[in-house]
Amino acid sequence: VAYEFKAIDHIQLAAPKGSEQEARKFYSEILGFSEVDKPPVLKKRGGAWFQSGSIQLHIGVEEPFVPAKKAHPAFEVGKLEELKEHLKRRGIEVIEDDNLPGANRFFVSDPFGNRLEFLEWMK
């Protein structure tokens, strides 16, 4: 093969029209992602872009909107238990799961119903 896959450039999740402020509250204020500017040509589409380290997450407007309840991104996290407690203190429902050998993990839903996984590999 003459080509190679190098990395995932970004993750895109959908949200309903007009939900940008709610996305900012969840992804920036609660999870700690920084909002990054969308290119001017894409701003009129709505949504918002966020970044944490090398992870870029795009929230795109989709009408009609249907949340991703099964398909999901999985974020590898340091200090997973601290994140879990942080989310619980903010009223976010944490769904425990121990079915991945070698890792601790849990799931949450964003304000729009999209499933998110957070995991930490055990050493």
Protein language model features and the residues they cover:
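Vicinal oxygen chelate
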Residues: 1-6, 90-123
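N-terminal beta-strand motif that seeds the catalytic metal site of vicinal oxygen chelate
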Residues: 1-24, 71-73
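Core segments of cupin and vicinal oxygen chelate
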Residues: 13-56
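Short acidic/glycine-enriched loop/turn segments that link adjacent beta-strands
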Residues: 42-46, 67-69, 100-104
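Conserved beta-strand in the GNAT
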Residues: 58-60, 116-117
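Mid-chain, well-packed structural core segment of small domains
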Residues: 69-87
